[in-house]
Amino acid sequence: MSSGGLLLLLGLLTLWEALTPVSSTDRPEFCELPEDSGPCKGLFHVFYYNSDQNQRLEFIYGGCYGNANNFKTIEECKRTCAA
């Protein structure tokens, strides 16, 4: 396959992955964790997945510790934890 064909295939696979929602059975367990600002005093606007409301919500992260249900962008949160 030519390099142009490989690039096209890679682009199509990337687009498919971005547009395919994650089912609740495929959702990582950390998506069920509550928001956790951590003990530090930073003021970082980040997002977490609220499994009770089935929504992606913003919260203030202190900058350390916390848990894995913490995303820099709403798009990253959606890709990882979308229902």
Curated annotation (Swiss-Prot):
It holds the Pfam family Kunitz_BPTI. Keywords: Disulfide bond, Protease inhibitor, Secreted, Serine protease inhibitor, Signal. Gene3D superfamilies: Pancreatic trypsin inhibitor Kunitz domain. GO terms for molecular function: serine-type endopeptidase inhibitor activity. The keyword Secreted applies. Residues 31-81 form the BPTI/Kunitz inhibitor domain. It comes from the Eukaryota. One of its GO terms (cellular component) is extracellular space. The record marks 41-42 as: Reactive bond for trypsin. Its main location: secreted. InterPro entries: Kunitz_BPTI, Kunitz_BPTI_sf, Prtase_inh_Kunz-CS, TFPI/VKTCI-like. Residues 1-24 form the signal peptide. Belongs to the venom Kunitz-type family. This is Kunitz-type serine protease inhibitor nigrescinin-3. It comes from Cryptophis nigrescens.
